Regions:
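Ubiquitin-like/PB1-type beta-grasp interaction modules and other compact soluble beta-rich domains
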Residues: 1-91
Length: 92
């Protein structure tokens, strides 16, 4: 098993909590971890996924680097990795 941390900011922090430790099977990707996270945090699925796909407007960071949904499906996780979630930016 691989232990990672999921951190949430802004509106997501209110919905999901600030920090969630998560154990995923070895070889899991960022996308796999987010699917598992959505199963453990009830409000996460509706906010992060649409029709089983990660919503494109969710801002993802992986170990302090911004990634997109396609990257999330390819990046393998290691112990201690961090995934950060930001809601879409809006306003003016």
């Amino acid at each position: 098993m691989t232990e990672v941390t999921i951190r949430a900011f802004a509106q997501f922090r209110e919905l999901f909590g600030a920090e969630t430790p998560l154990e995923v099977p070895a070889g899991s990707t960022v996308a796999d971890a987010l699917v598992q996270f959505a199963k453990t945090v009830p409000s996460a699925e509706a906010e992060l996924f649409e029709n089983g796909e990660l919503k494109g407007h969710v801002v993802l960071m992986y170990n302090r680097e911004r990634i997109d949904a396609e990257d999330a499906a390819e990046l393998s996780l290691e112990d201690g990795d961090e995934i950060v979630l930001y809601p879409p930016v809006s306003g003016g």
